[in-house]
Amino acid sequence: MTTDNDTAAMNGATALIETLAECGVELCIANPGTSEMHLVQALDRVPKMRSVLALFEGVCTGAADGYARMTGKPAATLLHLGPGLANGIANLHNARRANSPMINIVGNHPNYHVGFDAPLTSNIDTLARNYSSWIKSESTESTLAQDGADAYTATLRQTPGSQGQIATLIMGADAAWGESQGPVAPNALPQRSKITSDVIDAIASKIEAGGKVALLLEHHGVSPEALANASKISAKTGCRLFTGTFPARVDGGPGNPEVERLPYFPEQVLQTLTGLDHLVLVGGEPPASFFAYRGIPGQLVPEGCTVSRLTQNEEDAVDALSRLADRLGAAAETVKTFERRVTPRPTGPLDTKSIIQAVAA
């Protein structure tokens, strides 16, 4: 952090980067332009945050998404006005769906310059609204640091449905170069809400009633701790465990809890779930076809299968599954894990199957 003597002359950009670094943001992936030059200088001044130049904005947003999935922490992106933001939107869509925490810092013209309709002027708010759970577009040099702290907090606040955890801070160049009061302290960290005992009892009763039951685990429900608790429930009750077709992240391989993944095509999903009497949602929604197909239902729940919910996406799935395991008497059960399989070297003609087998061996 800077000294008292330094903060008096600190500009908004440096106050913002100092604040984000104190919050715990360690990486900024940048494709800056003229409006973001003060941010680039600030990144050089704050060694606690590493900056990486990317030559295309989609790389910035895609890398930040991957970083968040692997670390659970937000990275920052630095993008140049509306066109730069637009170039990164495809991967921002993926990040929103994956509930990846991310902070987008988007440079903009000062308010007094927007009216001149310069070549890169656009409605950045409209672009950002498609995938952001938090937007701030009127920052000044005196609010920019606190806005950064609020953006960080927003990325850790789980939101209902598919709103995601992306914060977009649209920063006028004058807020970056203007004199600030220095960095601010991080906000208190948000916590996931916990479900009630009534929900635990209701789900336990459905599982204990008999019939074929499956847990569909998504988002927070596929963390290693959540999967371990789900595996104990499966060992005790015989219920099946599924993740969605494309989970944001799931730890597989030998030693990790065993879980099935739903296939891609709708006919295969329906076939996989055929015979189920009850499907329990742990985060996420009932499985749906990626596209509409003639003669195939959009929601892929077999006829006669009822659906209930243990947790919403924003609720604490680890705690819920742990308490459900206790309620079912499964806390002492052994977690079933993937085992290492020895893959023999292939023989015969070279084809797709033998190539994959050779790589695996």
Language-model-detected regions and their locations in the chain:
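N-terminal alpha/beta PP-like core and its mobile active-site loop of ThDP/TPP-dependent enzymes
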Residues: 2-344, 348, 358-361
